[in-house]
């Protein structure tokens, strides 16, 4: 059945307007962007096929034009609509953590880091530099590759902190496996960084590990004391 033939209030766009965007499933949200499906497939059914084909919404939205347009019914226009939606979300996230923004909402930080790091195919170790009022100075990617206790150099972190005159920092890195659970090596790195930063009287507020669907906070687990 085509979406236009659905009972009033059940079609994704009408459901969004009447119940709010958060009430829509991933497939329904994507269907709003797609607008139409294929012969014999509604936009929601097409969206569900697309999500399943890529193993999830995030993988679909991070796929290349060539990969996405191999799917029946998906051409450059639909791909462009999807990319525009992704970029709008990314820009809103960046605006929320722009320079001078006071970092008072943990959810904003999580959303920003998820957008920055969750789709990387390799490990990235980064640092969010803050002033004494916990206002954002800069987000910097420091190390790439296999992140372990031997590849993260505290002296480089300290050097950057001094250069930017930061008073506090949040460090973060991603797990390309998609599993955010910190490793023993992650905990060792954190302790080394904490000790190094203490020598220059800078606070390590948190170490966040980014997976596909979640972020694990060392501070929330009581590991930054």
Swiss-Prot record:
Sequence positions that bind Zn(2+): 173, 175, 186
All copies of domain MPN, residue ranges: 102-224
Coiled-coil features, chain-numbered ranges: none
Name of protein: UPF0758 protein Spea_3837
Gene3D superfamilies in UniProt: Cytidine Deaminase, domain 2 (3.40.140.10)
Similarity comment text for this entry: Belongs to the UPF0758 family.
PANTHER family assigned to the protein according to its UniProt record, in alphabetical order: DNA REPAIR PROTEIN RADC (PTHR30471), UPF0758 PROTEIN YEES-RELATED (PTHR30471:SF3)
Listed GO MF terms: metal ion binding; metallopeptidase activity
Protein's UniProt keywords contain Heme: no
Keyword list, A-Z: Hydrolase, Metal-binding, Metalloprotease, Protease, Zinc
A Pfam match: RadC
Highest taxon of source: Bacteria
Example GO BP: proteolysis
Motif (JAMM motif): 173-186
């Amino acid at each position: 059945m085509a979406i236009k033939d659905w009972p009033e209030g059940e079609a994704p766009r009408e459901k969004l307007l009447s119940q709010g965007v958060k009430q829509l499933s991933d497939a329904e949200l994507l269907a709003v962007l797609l607008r139409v499906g294929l012969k014999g497939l509604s936009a929601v059914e097409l969206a569900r096929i697309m999500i399943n084909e890529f193993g999830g919404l995030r993988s679909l939205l991070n796929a290349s034009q060539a990969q996405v347009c191999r799917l029946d019914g998906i051409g450059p226009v639909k791909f462009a609509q999807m990319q525009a939606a992704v970029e709008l979300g990314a820009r809103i996230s960046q605006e929320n953590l722009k320079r001078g923004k006071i970092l008072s909402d943990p959810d904003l930080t999580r959303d920003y880091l998820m957008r920055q790091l969750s789709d990387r195919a390799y490990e990235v170790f980064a640092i969010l530099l803050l002033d004494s009022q916990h206002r954002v100075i800069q987000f910097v990617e420091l190390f790439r590759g296999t992140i372990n206790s031997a590849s993260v150099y505290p002296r480089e972190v300290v050097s950057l902190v001094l250069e930017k005159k930061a008073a506090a920092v949040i460090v973060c890195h991603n797990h390309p496996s998609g599993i955010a659970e910190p490793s023993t090596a992650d905990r060792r790195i954190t302790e080394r960084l904490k000790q190094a930063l203490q020598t220059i009287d800078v606070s390590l507020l948190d170490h966040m590990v980014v997976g596909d669907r979640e972020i694990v906070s060392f501070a929330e687990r009581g590991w930054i004391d």
